A protein has these predicted regions:
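Conserved catalytic core of nucleotide polymerization and phosphodiester-bond processing enzymes
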Residues: 1-143, 153-525
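Core domains of carbohydrate- and sulfate-ester-processing enzymes
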Residues: 145-148
Length: 525
């Protein structure tokens, strides 16, 4: 078994990487123009490099270089990259993946991504559309004009079809702008004590670039088996609902309202903000899936309807968002598809996930898988792409709770962690006993625990609304773990005072306009 002692980490992991950014001897500033299938991704086999432009920067000066040719004809660039301490690029995962296709080992390359650097500086202020090279450059005082090549690329013209005399200055402009931004940005990050976060993002970027070359592989037998089971169950639920409702059109709001509130005598769920039933802009009662999930049953007939309706909706979502796509991939693509990790798309600083679009006959149009929150019950459908590899899952047990217990110095939470208390089971028990409309309709205790997990840490993230059972649970959580709740309250007070908050690990988040109301409630938190 390998241990960390058996692994020699690259020289740039840690302080040495930050020192290199600040006091480098040689770096490369890089930009590629490629053919444009799937936005020019290196993961698309039919894409090729059209043009590479780069600067070799040393204390003695800057050398401009470029080369027309594909990924198998970039020897001079590869030599410069290997001789440099790091590579600078904007949205560097793109360039890194093309370097990998050119034969370079990404584990040996330190990268500096000006897009990620700006994401770190901006905290939660910038969306992805605010992190383009043009917008970032303008924030540092470097204006830019629209190049004709850039205009054509935005209109979908492949760079391979753009005249060289137009494409070359466009590519050089991006390289030079990236260099100017890098010089300003790295100094600002150092001054603001954020450079360690930028390094972490950049190290992660190279790992993600490498990981995305590995496809996700579905087990064809298991996919077909579970698909048939879910379709059969869905059809049976539809039949039972038709009998129970007298065959009403479940898509008709008018018919559904009459059935729920006149025949079954449900009480309309109350909007906690307005203290009135949820209504449409026209004043009709809302019967969306989210609203109906808040219905509380008091009769056996109501119980029966909710059990059928909740399960039917869940199956419908699982089929449309996951299994239909999986079946298409198994039938038409040998069970193989590619996913991507998205950087700079979340307010929290985390990653999101999505899939590359795939044209499947089943849909008649390109479709992408839903990978951000893959249902737990479908994880076993994935298998290794190669026979000599394994697929495994690692998960930190109750990780959010452990971090909160440490940050809040909460003695109750810390003791429960030492004693191995199952906090998810407790959540399920509280919600079940208080007749939460979702949990109370699940007969199996293990499944109740699993479905309650998403609520266990709601109070950690400001959650306090929902069903009566959820509200009661959140209040109990805050009272039980006073060290955690007091720490979070102090953080909220700091944010109300300053308009921003710095986390213990250094990330800075901005909440302009945050105020404390007369009730003591702090807005924006």
């Amino acid at each position: 078994m390998y241990t960390m002692k058996d692994v020699e980490l690259p020289w740039f992991v840690g302080k040495a990487g930050m020192d290199a950014y600040l006091n480098f001897k040689q770096c490369v500033i890089l930009d590629y123009e490629t053919t444009n299938i799937n936005k020019g991704s290196a993961l698309e086999p039919d894409n090729e490099i059209v043009l590479a432009c780069w600067l070799v920067v040393t204390p003695e000066g800057v050398t401009q270089k470029h080369h027309w040719g594909n990924q198998y004809d970039q020897s001079e660039l590869e030599k410069d990259v290997k001789e440099s301490q790091f590579v600078v690029a904007h949205n560097a995962k793109f360039e890194l993946q093309w370097l990998k296709r050119s034969g370079l080992e990404l584990r040996d390359i330190l990268v500096y991504d000006t897009m990620l650097g700006e994401w770190v500086r901006g905290g939660n202020r910038f969306k992805l559309q605010h992190l383009s090279l043009e917008e970032v450059g303008q924030r540092y005082g470097y204006g830019s004009k629209e190049e004709i090549a850039g205009y054509l690329i935005k209109k979908g013209v492949c760079p391979s079809d753009i005249p060289r005399e137009w494409l070359l200055p466009y590519c050089y402009r991006d390289v030079e702008l990236s260099y100017l931004v890098f010089q300003e940005q790295v100094g600002a990050l150092h001054k603001e004590e954020l450079l360690h976060l930028a390094l972490t993002r950049n190290l992660c970027c190279a790992a993600l670039a490498d990981m995305e070359f590995n496809p996700s592989q579905l087990d064809a037998y298991e996919v077909k088996k579970v698909y048939d089971e879910y379709v059969a169950e869905f059809q049976e639920l539809e039949r039972q609902l038709a009998v129970l409702t007298g065959g009403i059109n479940m898509s008709s709001n008018k018919q559904l309202i009459e059935f729920l509130y006149e025949k079954l005598n449900f009480s309309p769920p109350i909007n906690p903000r307005t203290k009135e039933p949820f209504k449409t802009p026209k004043g009709d009662l809302q019967v969306t899936v989210d609203v109906l999930a808040k219905l509380e049953s008091h009769t056996s007939e109501q119980d029966k309807f909710l059990q059928l309706y909740v399960r039917r909706n869940k199956l419908s979502a699982l089929l449309s968002k996951n299994l239909e796509f999986f079946m298409g991939i198994v039938e038409e693509k040998g069970g193989e598809f590619f996913g991507r990790f998205n950087q700079a798309t979340t307010d929290t600083g985390g990653l999101s996930a999505s899939g590359f679009q795939v044209l499947l006959k089943r849909f008649g149009e390109p479709k992408a898988p839903q990978l951000q929150n893959l249902p737990r019950e479908f994880k076993y459908l994935f298998t290794a792409h190669d026979e000599d590899e394994l697929v495994f899952e690692w998960d930190g047990s109750q990780l959010e709770f452990r971090v909160a217990a440490d940050e809040g110095r909460d003695p109750v939470a810390q003791q429960e962690i030492r004693d191995g208390v199952d906090v998810h089971a407790f959540t399920a028990q509280v919600l079940y006993e208080n007749k939460d409309p979702e949990i109370s309709n699940i007969p199996d205790a293990g499944e109740r625990r699993q479905q309650s997990k998403k609520h266990t840490f709601r109070p950690l993230f400001g959650g306090g609304s929902g069903s009566k059972a959820l509200v009661a649970y959140c209040e109990y959580f805050k009272d039980k773990y006073q060290g955690i709740s007091t720490t979070q309250r102090n953080w909220a007070l700091t944010t109300a005072s300053k308009g921003w908050f710095r986390t213990p690990y250094g990330m800075k988040f901005y909440f302009p306009g945050t105020k404390m109301q007369a009730s003591g409630y702090i807005t924006n938190t």
